[in-house]
């Protein structure tokens, strides 16, 4: 097995949406830097970013009830919802910039307008939804959201969900037309097409075997060319690990102090996919329900209109599965290999504390097709077993770490881990993930390149006009940006968004 050695400015591990976004930011800010990308698979965006491996929701907290929690006094805390929405607005602005500059074309291939709805049943839940609407609509980011508990109005909005519904239990839904369906696989491929045409070296079929820091502070990455069965050694002063579920083992190999006391717990997602075109055409929205009491946030059920390869699809889920793999294409030894002396206490503490999650996963794994269909019928009463089939989506590795709240705390979100000197950063976690990619990668730049920020800031503000500001505190700017990005991205948003 022969070996070669080369040096570059930036190494990106993984050809998913995160590396594609960071690479695109670098190309705009420092076009002269040399960038190399290493991807184990044969194409870009094939793991978590692939359109069949995630929900495709442009997460802006318009419909996801887990981002708005109820306080003890009955008030609704919308801070997390505002935060997620702000982050999605940053992504919209950057994507619109790339389209305007002609760096990516045909935005309709990766983003479409689709109403985002929250639907609940039962008196208590309807009351919660009404209070949630009141709280959200005090904020300009959620202007245009409306609620109805009138069955005839709901029949217009969501006929597939209302047809055959015999229960007299109260039901209500909120609706906002500025929601989006995002094909992150298509977007990832577009971004890498742009990058490779501008000198970025993208290496498929290259597996990163080891990572180590050199005496000069640079990073040495040992890469196996799987087609040639050769080992290559590449060095760079900056390394980004964006390998989805595969990021944690590579972060551990860096040996940086920040990688200690961090573990990962893999959860696979499954969706029911509709095979009946007549049924698919009856629904046009992303409708999110409320997680059952005691169920984790990842379990929020939703019925989604999707656009994949230009074709309308209908998916319901997620259902959870379990495999010890950290990637769909990973190894059954991934979980056990990730347990190290520095995180074993963290992992054991999480195991002891997260019994409800363990119980939930066991119940989910044991679900039959009939049982999954019963859950779907809570959304679509007339759903027929033969119209739906199960597909296995991507692996989500939930971060486990020690926090002020205690050891072994399970984190639901997306997290950047970087070294103190800013020479290496890794992206861990799950939802809202890809929707907030631009915000998260700007955070990487802030943490790892503080010395460059003063010179980069004018260009960043050109790409993301609201950079450094909270749009929720600048309603006029939000309205201007939201309308201009909608036009550039070809989003057909109704006038009610800003009435």
Swiss-Prot record:
Pfam families: Mqo. Keywords: FAD, Flavoprotein, Oxidoreductase, Tricarboxylic acid cycle. It comes from the Bacteria. The keyword Isomerase does not apply. InterPro entries: FAD/NAD-bd_sf, MQO. It catalyses: (S)-malate + a quinone = a quinol + oxaloacetate. Its cofactor is FAD. SUPFAM superfamilies: FAD/NAD(P)-binding domain. It is an enzyme of class 1 (oxidoreductase). Disulfide bonds: none annotated. Its EC number is 1.1.5.4. GO terms for biological process: tricarboxylic acid cycle. Pathway: Carbohydrate metabolism; tricarboxylic acid cycle; oxaloacetate from (S)-malate (quinone route): step 1/1. GO terms for molecular function: 2-hydroxyglutarate dehydrogenase activity; L-malate dehydrogenase (quinone) activity. Belongs to the MQO family. HAMAP family: MQO (MF_00212). This is Probable malate:quinone oxidoreductase.
């Amino acid at each position: 097995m022969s070996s070669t050695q080369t040096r570059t400015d930036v190494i990106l591990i993984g050809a998913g949406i995160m590396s594609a976004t960071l690479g695109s930011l670098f190309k705009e800010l420092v076009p002269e830097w040399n960038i190399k990308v290493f991807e184990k698979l044969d194409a870009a965006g094939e793991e978590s970013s692939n359109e069949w491996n995630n929900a495709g929701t442009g997460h802006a907290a318009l419909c996801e009830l887990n981002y708005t929690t109820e306080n003890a006094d009955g008030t609704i805390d919308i801070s997390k919802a505002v935060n997620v929405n702000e982050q999605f607005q940053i992504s919209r602005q950057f994507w619109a910039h790339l389209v305007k500059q002609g760096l990516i074309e045909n935005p309709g291939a990766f983003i479409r307008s689709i109403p985002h709805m929250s639907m609940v049943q039962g008196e208590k839940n309807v009351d919660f939804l009404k209070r949630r609407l009141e709280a959200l609509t005090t904020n300009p980011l959620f202007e245009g959201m409306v609620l109805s508990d009138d069955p005839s109005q709901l029949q217009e909005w969501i006929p597939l969900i209302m047809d055959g519904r015999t229960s007299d239990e109260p039901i209500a839904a909120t609706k906002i037309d500025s929601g989006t369906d995002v094909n992150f696989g298509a977007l990832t491929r577009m971004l890498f097409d742009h990058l490779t045409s501008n000198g970025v070296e993208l290496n498929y079929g290259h597996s990163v075997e080891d990572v180590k820091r050199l005496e000069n502070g640079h990073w040495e990455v040992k890469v196996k060319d799987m087609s040639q069965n050769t080992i290559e050694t590449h060095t760079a002063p900056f390394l980004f690990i964006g390998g989805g579920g595969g990021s944690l083992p590579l972060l551990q190999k860096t040996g940086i102090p920040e990688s200690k006391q961090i573990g990962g717990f893999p959860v696979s997602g499954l969706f029911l996919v509709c095979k009946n075109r007549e049924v698919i055409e009856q629904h046009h929205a992303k409708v999110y329900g409320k997680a059952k009491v005691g169920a984790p946030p990842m379990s929020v059920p939703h019925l989604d209109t999707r656009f994949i390869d230009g074709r309308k699809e209908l998916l319901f889920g997620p259902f959870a599965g379990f495999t010890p793999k950290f990637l769909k294409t990973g190894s059954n030894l991934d979980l056990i290999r990730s347990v190290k002396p520095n995180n074993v206490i963290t992992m054991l503490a999480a195991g002891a504390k997260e019994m409800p999650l363990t119980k939930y996963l066991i119940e989910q794994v044991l679900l039959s097709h009939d049982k999954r269909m019963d859950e779907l019928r809570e959304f679509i009463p007339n759903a027929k077993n033969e119209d739906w089939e199960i597909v296995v989506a991507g692996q989500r590795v939930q971060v486990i770490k020690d926090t002020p709240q205690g050891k072994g705390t399970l984190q639901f979100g997306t997290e950047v881990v970087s070294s103190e000197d800013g020479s290496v950063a890794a992206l861990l976690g799950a939802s809202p993930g890809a929707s907030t990619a631009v915000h998260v990668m700007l955070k990487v730049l802030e943490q790892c390149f503080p010395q460059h920020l003063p010179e980069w800031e004018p260009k960043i503000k050109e790409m993301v006009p609201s950079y450094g500001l909270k749009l929720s505190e600048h309603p006029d700017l939000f309205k201007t940006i939201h309308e201009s990005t909608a036009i550039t991205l070809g989003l057909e948003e109704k006038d009610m968004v800003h009435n």
